[in-house]
Amino acid sequence: MTPLFSTPRAQRGKIRLAPILLWVLSVGLIAPDAAAGFYSDRPAAIEVIKSAELAGVDAVWAADLLSAAERQQSILDAIARPAEKTKPWHQYRQIFLTQRRIDEGVAFWDQHATVLDSVSLTTGVPPEVIVAIIGVETFYGRITGSYRVIDALATLAFDYPKRSTFFTGELEAFLLLAWEADKDPLALKGSYAGAMGYGQFMPSSYRAYATSYDGEGAPDIWDNPNDAISSVGNYLRAHGWRSGERVVVPATVTDPSPQLFEGGLKPSQSVAHWIALGMLPSEPVDEDAIAAPIDLEAQQGRAYWLGLQNFYVITRYNHSAMYAMAVWDLSQSIAAARRETAL
């Protein structure tokens, strides 16, 4: 028998999986803990199915898919302790700024130089930044995640109240993605948060920003590095990347008051404003540029920067100053290493 989700889309609504699952449950062939993972009968799941149906997804297909989703406790454990929240900056940085990751970044750049140059030309995003994001996210496509995306999103949508609204939206987007792209949703793997492919796009980001490099077919961010590169560049461009502008500037602080850093990651005041408050750039920078002060825990005390618009754009990929700094530092290390190999 052809698996339900690998059948052509036009035939999917003619096959029912949920009754089979209900029969299996009724005769006790699935342990209670595992059975608790079937979500299709939950009120919140029914709302997801209704929303998907309004968007054009077959309701039977959506219900069957949610019936196949399994609750994963390891996902709930992982999301409770992300590295950005459990490690100080100097330890977090060491995860990504390794010689191996730098060397493989150079190799990835060399292998895809033509595509990177083309995407950089159309988006304004430097190749090294695109390479670094893919390097931080998945080690250049090597580690893209082992969880079924449907399990991750269903678990977090229905069993993680703290962010249920966000992950419910992502679950709905995933149903649409799988239906529109004619993908087998049970075969798609990703991170514990449901992020997918080389660049770890969430389903809503895929639908909004993923692009096919050659313009043919749905973007394949899972197996096609060209589409992944194009999609990362397009994501940053769409979030306001400014071609040729700086990203972040190191600084010293005369009076490191906690109130100085309470404004968040979005640039809100001019560099001149921050200078007047005692935050002094260590490198030349346009004092009219809008910036946000960044404060991270270094091995010896605190480290400070002024984050400019492009730094903020990187944080739209992952809302963390440490993430953006890791991407930026890795990008500069990769670019420097590649220049050295060219000598």
Where are these regions (language model features)?
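Functionally critical loop-and-helix segments that line ligand-binding/catalytic clefts
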Residues: 200
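Cell-wall glycan-active module
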Residues: 1-5, 15-21, 25-164, 168-189, ...
